[in-house]
Structures are given as structure tokens and as C-alpha cells.
Amino acid sequence: MKCLVVLTALFGISTASFLGCNLSPVWGVKNAYRSGLQTYWCPPGLKFDPFGCCCDFPFDDLVEDLAGLLGGAGNGGNGGGGNGGNGGGGNGGNNGNGNGNNGLKKYETCYDC
């Protein structure tokens, strides 16, 4: 779907032809709209007109984005020390740090229908 949206944006074709723009609000979930089986999320503060603006932001990805907004993933654990060399005891290897991704993504652009 992401590829499709990028292509439509590049060639100036409205996403309406793919989404149908038949969006209806999702009860109990602010800024969420449903089109068929897919749910879309419109970023807060953006004026959303079901017949004039389609936000191509699958609601399924919202959980990941919220996790990123709330602090992101923690740092990866340190690697274990290396094995000592044979004969005399060797020094332990350095610990390796691994930073986790914060999972924060920007909202997709809102397309005119």
C-alpha cells in the first residue's frame, strides 16, 4: 500500500480512486476513519473532510507510533565479555552496546480526493 501511495503521489493520481473515499468515523476512536476493512488515522489538528481529504495512514501502525512518541524502545543490552585466551587468562572482550529504534514515524501526507 505504501508503494502504491508513493506512486500515486508521484504521478498526481488521487488516492481516492484506490480508497474510494467512502470514509466513516470509527465510533469511540478520535480521528480514526474506516474505509471498507481498512482503518485510517488523521493526525490531530488537520481538518478532515471525508469527501475532500484522505489520510493514508493505516490505523494498525498507530500503536508503533504511539510507542515511539511515549519514549521509544530502550537501549539494547550489553554484549557478554569475550572468552579468555588459552594458557594465561585473557582479558574479557569489550561489551557491545546496541541501541533500539525509537519506532517514531511521521504521519503520512493527507491527499486530496
From Swiss-Prot:
The keyword Signal applies. Residues 1-16 form the signal peptide. It comes from Margaritifera margaritifera (Freshwater pearl mussel). It is found in: Secreted. This is Uncharacterized shell protein 10. Its main location: secreted. GO terms for cellular component: extracellular region. Keywords: Secreted, Signal. Residues 81-101 have a biased composition (Gly residues). Nacreous layer of shell (at protein level). Residues 81-103 are annotated as: Disordered.
